[in-house]
C-alpha cells in the first residue's frame, strides 16, 4: 500500500515537470529560427519557472577551474571590422578577459560589450586583451557592430567578437545552457601562460561590472611582481599584505589603528 501511494505521489509531481519540458522542447524545435530566437529571449529574460525545468548547463560534462589551463579555443572573429581566425594561442604572453554573452541583438548584452569596448585602452595598458563570445555567427556580429548604438547596436568596437556557432567553446568553458543553446554570462581571466586566474558566471538578466575584471587583472599582476597579496577591495593605491604571520602585522596595524 505504501509503495503504491508513493508511486502515485511521484507520478502526480513528476508529470507537470515532464509536460513542461516536452512543451518547451517541442515548441522550440518546431518554430522557425527567428521565432525560436524570440521565444527563447522572452522566456529566458522573464525568469519564469518553466525555464528552470528545461535548461541545464554543460558544467556536468566539464567545468574549467581556477589554477587549471584554460580550454583551447579557435574560431572566426570580428577584429576591427574584418573577419579573422582566432585561437587561444594568439594571446600567449598576455592576459585575456574572455567573456560570454547569450545573443546578439538583445538587451543587456550591448550594454556590457560597449562598456568593455570603451575601457579597452585601460586593459591594453596592463597587457590585457578582451574577447566577447556568443553562439551567433561572425556575420551576425558584424551586422550588430554596423548597427548604431542608439538603435541597440554596438557601433565601432575596440574589442574582439568571437563566433561560437558550433557552441563548442561555450560547452568547453561550462557555460552553455544545453537546451536553450546559448551561453550564460561567464567571464574568465586567463594569464599569459594560459592559466585561469578567475571565473564568474551571471544569470541571464543581470549585466557585469567592467571595473572589477580590470581591478583583478591589476591585482594578479601586482602579486606576480611584488610577491605580496591583495586584501579586500584592493586598488593600486591600497596597501598590500606580506604573506607571513609576523610581516602581515604591518598591514593590520596600519588599517586598524
Curated annotation (Swiss-Prot):
The modification Phosphothreonine is found at residue 147. Its EC number is 1.11.1.24. Its main location: mitochondrion. Phosphorylated by LRRK2; phosphorylation reduces perodixase activity. The enzyme can be inactivated by further oxidation of the cysteine sulfenic acid (C(P)-SOH) to sulphinic acid (C(P)-SO2H) and sulphonic acid (C(P)-SO3H) instead of its condensation to a disulfide bond. Residues 1-62 form a transit peptide. The active site is at 109 (cysteine sulfenic acid (-soh) intermediate). GO terms for cellular component: cytoplasm; cytosol; early endosome; mitochondrion; protein-containing complex. It catalyses: a hydroperoxide + [thioredoxin]-dithiol = an alcohol + [thioredoxin]-disulfide + H2O. The modification N6-acetyllysine is found at residue 92. The modification N6-succinyllysine is found at residues 84, 92. Ubiquitous. Thiol-specific peroxidase that catalyzes the reduction of hydrogen peroxide and organic hydroperoxides to water and alcohols, respectively. Plays a role in cell protection against oxidative stress by detoxifying peroxides. Acts synergistically with MAP3K13 to regulate the activation of NF-kappa-B in the cytosol. Required for the maintenance of physical strength. The active site is a conserved redox-active cysteine residue, the peroxidatic cysteine (C(P)), which makes the nucleophilic attack on the peroxide substrate. The peroxide oxidizes the C(P)-SH to cysteine sulfenic acid (C(P)-SOH), which then reacts with another cysteine residue, the resolving cysteine (C(R)), to form a disulfide bridge. The disulfide is subsequently reduced by an appropriate electron donor to complete the catalytic cycle. In this typical 2-Cys peroxiredoxin, C(R) is provided by the other dimeric subunit to form an intersubunit disulfide. This is Thioredoxin-dependent peroxide reductase, mitochondrial.
